[in-house]
A protein has these predicted regions:
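RNA-contacting regions in translation and RNA-metabolism proteins
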Residues: 1-43, 51-76
């Protein structure tokens, strides 16, 4: 799932080499921390948060098919 988020995020930004994803395993949920270049933050979040919302929905759907729970956090 980390690779999927990395691929999606890199396709959205102008500085794909600056994109990193860190997995943080909680007790019952996997948190994926997404870090991007500060210049690309707006592109990842989108107007009124629409893009990151859709990315989160997609990641939850993939996780649900695997019987897992996941959350995506954008870290600056």
């Amino acid at each position: 799932m980390k690779d999927l988020l990395l691929c999606i995020a890199r396709s959205l930004v102008e500085h794909p080499d600056d994109v990193t994803v860190t997995e943080v395993q909680g007790t019952d949920e996997l948190t994926l921390e997404l870090r991007v270049n500060p210049d690309d933050m707006g592109k990842v979040i989108g107007r009124q948060g629409r893009i990151i919302k859709e990315v989160r929905i997609l990641m939850r759907a993939v996780a649900q098919r695997k019987g897992r729970r996941v959350s995506v956090e954008v870290v600056d």
